[in-house]
Design a protein with these regions (language model features):
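Intrinsically disordered, low-complexity Pro/Gly/Ser/Thr-rich segments with frequent PxxP/GP/PP motifs
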Residues: 49-74
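Structural beta-strand segments of beta-rich domains
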Residues: 22-26, 66
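A short tyrosine-centered beta-strand micro-motif
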Residues: 78-80
Length: 115
């Protein structure tokens, strides 16, 4: 007697999309002058750098004017550490990362870079 409603409930739940699947991707847009070879995010002010997001790209680098899908990051404010092909390492502080949106870093955003 309870088997049919239970079966219907199980099927309905398995077909319902998960919230994670509904989320639109976060993307980084490289507007610097050089190809980015490493990109890490840390919650703003914490220096707790996450994994290299360039691993998400087919060739593991983000050319000028290319976009990169960001994974395993929740929306919030982040410091972004990037390394480009010239060997320059830069940190851009307090970047707003929004679900389903693109955040960009331009050459003018880069200061205090080391190499």
């Amino acid at each position: 007697m309870y088997r049919v409603p239970l079966l219907i409930l199980i099927v309905a739940l398995s077909l319902a999309p998960s919230r994670a699947a509904d989320r639109k991707p976060i993307r980084f847009w490289n507007l610097t002058l050089h190809t980015v070879v490493s990109l890490q995010l840390s919650p703003a002010g914490q220096q707790a750098w996450g994994r290299d997001q360039c691993e998400n790209d087919r060739d593991h680098e983000v050319d000028h004017d290319e976009r990169l899908r960001i994974t395993d990051v929740v929306p919030g404010r982040y410091d972004i550490r990037l390394k480009d092909k010239t060997g320059r390492v830069c940190v851009v502080k307090n970047v707003d990362v929004t679900d389903g949106a693109v955040f960009s870093i331009e050459e003018k955003d880069l200061s205090g870079c080391g190499g």
